[in-house]
């Protein structure tokens, strides 16, 4: 059985139960707030919420960010199954997960992403589900970069034509002409600086704004190739 599609809580290796505490706080936020957009995911979107670019683009959009640093596909899936999207009715769910599934194949991870999409759809039948591409990682070209690119390719194929599911490439400008990634864009060659966040958030903001502002966006949006 593919472990990426089996809902699993993050192991409490430190023994302080922080992950479960964060999850419960997110559930509480759902009861108290009425977001238009919910972000679900991992370290990439957990860290960008502290950048100037996030405050510029997404703070005004009535967003909740339910991203947790070490999450893999199976951990986000567990959170969805255990209340992360209960008592809330956002117009859009942005799902970014998979880059931490380093021990799984690209195909397994893509199936894990699809399992999350399916579960989100069960919880929120009419919400738009937006899937930003996984980013390249590592200062120089490496196998994890290649795998993330393959995951993006497989996810595009698995989700093409699904109701109100949209993929969006957000990696433009991160890899330089010599194949390297600058620490000015990714401070640890995985997570983003403010400059890097601006590069990935602009195309995402454009898509979310279109969905939120159009009366009938499903007539204007076509699934990404």
UniProtKB/Swiss-Prot annotation:
This is Platelet-activating factor acetylhydrolase IB subunit beta homolog. It comes from Drosophila melanogaster. Belongs to the 'GDSL' lipolytic enzyme family. Platelet-activating factor acetylhydrolase IB beta/gamma subunits subfamily. Does not interact with Lis-1. Pfam families: Lipase_GDSL_2. CDD domains: PAF_acetylesterase_like (cd01820). The lineage of its organism: Eukaryota, Metazoa, Ecdysozoa, Arthropoda, Hexapoda. The gene is Paf-AHalpha. Transmembrane segments: none annotated.
């Amino acid at each position: 059985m593919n472990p990426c599609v089996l809902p699993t809580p993050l192991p409490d290796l430190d023994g302080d139960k922080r992950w479960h505490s964060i999850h419960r706080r997110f559930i509480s936020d759902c009861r108290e707030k009425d977001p238009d957009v919910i972000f679900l995911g991992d370290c990439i979107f957990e860290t960008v919420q502290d950048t100037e670019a996030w405050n510029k683009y997404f703070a005004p959009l009535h967003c909740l960010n339910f991203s947790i640093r070490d999450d893999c596909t199976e951990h986000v899936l567990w959170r969805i199954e255990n209340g992360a999207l209960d008592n809330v009715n956002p117009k859009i769910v942005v799902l970014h997960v998979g880059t931490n599934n380093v021990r799984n194949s690209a195909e397994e991870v893509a199936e894990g992403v699809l399992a999350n999409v399916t579960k989100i759809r069960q919880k929120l039948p009419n919400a738009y589900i937006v899937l930003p591409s996984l980013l390249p990682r590592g200062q120089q070209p490496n196998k994890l970069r290649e795998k993330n690119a393959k995951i993006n390719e497989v996810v595009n194929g698995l989700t093409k034509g699904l109701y109100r599911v949209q993929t969006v490439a957000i990696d433009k400008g991160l890899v330089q002409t010599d194949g390297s990634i600058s620490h000015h864009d990714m401070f640890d060659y995985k997570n983003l600086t403010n400059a890097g966040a601006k590069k990935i958030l602009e195309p995402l903001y454009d898509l979310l704004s279109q969905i939120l502002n159009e009366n009938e966006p499903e007539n204007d949006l076509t699934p990404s190739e």
